[in-house]
């Protein structure tokens, strides 16, 4: 057999897949299941998106794009996100990826050495904790507190978690995972 890297012992799983198995078993017994656990809610793709995809394929736009993403898309995302957040975002600050997991891992590899701490939101994306520990770091969770307007970070509590060994704080918009404002 092949010897595998010891760090694989630290690689966690995404709990949503365990929930998916339990949901499938529940559904197999005839129960109604609303599959929100994987973010795959089977909503049909909007017709204008299908049309744009078909036009792009017909125009031969099927090869590689620039590493950080198509410039026009980055510009549109910067404008839209900036408008929603009430801030100015440059297209150079926007990177389009094929998914969240690879970029989270690359970010942590860039800013964290083994033994360092990273603060991450809980509830949040389970991959944060898994990848921090996989890469040899210490995952330190922080939470959001309910307020009259929704939820907010308890800044004093967050500051109390910061140590000289803290290398990063991951911020996660509460729209994902709990659709809160």
Predicted regions and their residues:
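N-terminal small-domain helix-loop-helix segment of the aminotransferase-like
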Residues: 5-99, 106
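CheY-like receiver
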Residues: 22, 107, 157-161
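Short acidic capping loops at alpha-helix termini that bridge into adjacent secondary structure
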Residues: 88-94, 114-117, 165
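Conserved PLP-anchoring active-site segment centered on the Schiff-base-forming lysine
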Residues: 110-132
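Active-site phosphate-binding strand-loop segment of PLP-dependent enzymes
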Residues: 140, 145-181
């Amino acid at each position: 057999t092949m010897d595998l890297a010891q760090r694989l012992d630290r690689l966690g799983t995404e709990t949503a897949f365990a929930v998916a198995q339990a949901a499938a078993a529940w559904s197999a017994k005839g129960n109604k299941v609303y599959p929100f656990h994987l973010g795959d809610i089977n909503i049909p793709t909007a017709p204008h998106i299908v049309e744009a995809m078909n036009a792009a394929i017909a125009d031969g736009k099927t090869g590689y794009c620039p590493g950080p993403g198509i410039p026009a898309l980055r510009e549109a995302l910067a404008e839209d996100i900036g408008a929603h957040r009430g801030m100015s975002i440059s297209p150079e600050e926007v990177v389009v990826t094929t998914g969240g997991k690879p970029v989270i891992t690359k970010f942590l590899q860039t800013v964290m050495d083994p033994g360092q701490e990273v603060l991450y939101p809980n509830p949040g994306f389970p991959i944060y904790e898994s990848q921090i520990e996989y890469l040899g770091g210490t995952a330190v969770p922080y939470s959001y507190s309910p307020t009259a307007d929704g939820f907010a970070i308890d800044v004093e509590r967050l500051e109390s978690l910061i140590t000289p060994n803290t290398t990063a704080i991951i911020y996660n918009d509460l729209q994902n995972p709990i659709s809160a404002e």
